[in-house]
Amino acid sequence: TTRQCLLNPNRNPTLSEVQIEEAVLESLGGEKLLWVGDGLLNDHTDGHVDTIARFVHPGVVVAMEPRTADDPNREVLATLIRDLESLTDAKGRRLEVVRVPSPGRVLDDAREVMPASYVNFYIANASVVVPTYGSPFDDEAVQRIAALFPGRTTRGVNAKAVLAGGGAFHCITQQKPQAGHARQQSPAPIPGPIPGLTS
């Protein structure tokens, strides 16, 4: 998760980082929570992590890297990659970071920078839908993400209109694992709402 999101005063003003981490791990049956810094500029979600990095396999994370000098997220993404490369997963493995390009400077109709992200893709049972933005990096991003999901059809779909409302395809969908693909060991049951914790 990002510190920008879960430590934002508008979300969990009375909880410390340690308290938030304990609540998340207990609720999800997790063993380790990986923290990174900030999300994308102008992100409607206060920096949800699914706009900057995604686990694609155990120990393997896909993240965007800036390719242009005018990328509005140049510093955030460079820091993210450096941070991810220094982290280990719950099994103690150093993360493998697969880089895809950032779409760069994507503007809305009012000429404001949009929080455009290729890693906010949606994974369906037999396909992957990658958000695109009419950027010169669209095709490369779709190809690189497709290589991470052999056996699935990967398509790029323009997401500018969706993004204008907040988030792209992963943000606007609710994923449900296919039957038979659950973890070997079930996580702890999710309790009711955690007092004071919002995501």
State the predicted function of each range.
Residues 1-190, 194-197:
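The feature marks the mature, well-folded catalytic cores of soluble enzymes
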